């Protein structure tokens, strides 16, 4: 799937929150606080997202219903891998170093990361 714009990502976040198809009016209502969109603008972005393979539009009824074709987890993996490859030469260590040096990691984050790595080590995983 092609990379999503910030606006497309915001739409996906709303779709991921729902376990059922969502109408464009529902999307517009739920995104109202974030963006001051008109319905036509939203429809244009949704059409672009469908072309990218991010959403499916069910047109079998009078009202169009939209569902995410990519799970939130799949998108995070794709984007995270892309960032790691492009910016950090595939080095998780360099990525973590950047987070730490830029004060993006709290003591709690560090503790949780240590616990996670210990768990992986105890299981014999990567």
Question: Can you describe what each PLM-predicted range is?
Answer:
Residues 1-14, 18, 74:
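Short alpha-helical segments that sit at the start of domains
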């Amino acid at each position: 799937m092609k990379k999503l714009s910030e606006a497309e990502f915001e739409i996906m976040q709303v779709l991921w929150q729902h376990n059922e198809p969502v109408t464009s009016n529902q999307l517009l209502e739920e995104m109202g606080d974030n963006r001051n969109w008109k319905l036509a603008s939203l429809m244009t972005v949704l059409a672009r997202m469908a072309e990218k393979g991010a959403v499916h539009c069910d047109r079998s009824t009078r009202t169009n219903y939209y569902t995410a074709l990519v799970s939130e987890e799949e998108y995070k993996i794709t984007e995270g891998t892309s960032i790691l490859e492009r910016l950090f030469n595939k080095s998780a260590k360099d990525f973590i170093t950047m987070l730490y040096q830029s004060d993006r990691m709290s003591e709690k984050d560090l503790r949780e990361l240590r616990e996670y790595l210990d768990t992986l080590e105890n299981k014999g995983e990567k």
